[in-house]
């Protein structure tokens, strides 16, 4: 992939957009995209989680198929596959994000989501009334609506690799015209969760097969090194990464 076709891996790993601007709205009414999605969920997707089976870790639990296509394209644009290491999609990041949103994190279990809501300062952090799962749903709807309006009627996942990069940079800069939430709010949480999934223990769905840890030389969840001290004294410590599941 050329530098002009997408966002380069080093751009992400250096932390583009890591300092998110505080965002806020002054209404607690459900955005149209969220209200529509909630009306279609009968029963709610979280009410009866699907039974786990052999390939349950590869199943989208929260995103609808169109939403999954968009989030997959977003992750692929943020961290494309190259000769340095696996891309975000190859590493399972879309599944990581989806499974996080399907659980307590998505519901905002540890977030204070009561009003009043007002425009905050950068130091005050997240100021929206939406938990992460709802923020993603509304953000994806706004993103695709903006792309359809400004990109010849195409959703984000239908754009070329180069056009996706341009759209994502506009999103990061807050230049994308969202109607329900601030564009930067969606970009900030997307980037944060993408990086978390890329470097997480594989037990959570991302960093598939420890490939990202191997790329950066991280040994994994090893609890002690006493038996290796003499073996590797004055030598480079090179071992295959071990995940939580590998050691359980």
Placement of each model-derived feature along the sequence:
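C-terminal segment of N-terminal export signals and the immediately downstream linker at the start
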Residues: 5-7, 26-73
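Substrate-recognition/specificity elements adjacent to catalytic centers across diverse enzyme folds
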Residues: 77
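Intrinsically disordered, low-complexity glycine/proline-rich and charged
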Residues: 18-28
């Amino acid at each position: 992939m050329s530098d002009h076709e997408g966002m380069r891996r080093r751009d992400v790993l250096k932390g583009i957009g890591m300092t998110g601007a505080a965002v806020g709205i002054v209404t607690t009414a459900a955005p149209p995209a969220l209200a529509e999605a909630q009306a279609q969920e009968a029963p709610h997707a979280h009410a009866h989680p699907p039974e786990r089976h052999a390939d349950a870790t590869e199943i989208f639990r929260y995103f609808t198929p169109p939403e999954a296509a968009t989030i997959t394209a977003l992750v692929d644009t943020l961290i494309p596959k190259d000769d340095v290491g696996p891309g975000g999609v190859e590493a399972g990041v879309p599944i990581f994000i989806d499974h996080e949103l399907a659980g307590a994190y998505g519901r905002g279990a540890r977030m204070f989501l009561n009003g009043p809501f007002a425009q905050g300062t950068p130091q005050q952090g997240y100021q929206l009334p939406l938990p992460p799962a709802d923020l993603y749903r509304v953000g994806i709807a706004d993103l695709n609506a903006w792309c359809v309006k400004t990109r010849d009627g195409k959703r984000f996942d239908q754009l070329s690799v180069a056009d996706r990069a341009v759209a994502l940079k506009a999103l990061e800069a807050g230049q994308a015209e969202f109607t329900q939430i601030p564009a930067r709010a969606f970009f900030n949480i997307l980037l944060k969760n993408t990086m978390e999934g890329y470097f997480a223990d594989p037990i959570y769905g991302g960093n598939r097969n420890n490939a990202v840890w191997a790329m950066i030389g991280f040994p994994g969840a090893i609890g002690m090194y006493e038996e290796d001290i003499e073996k590797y004294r004055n030598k480079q410590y090179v071992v295959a990464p071990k995940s939580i599941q590998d050691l359980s």
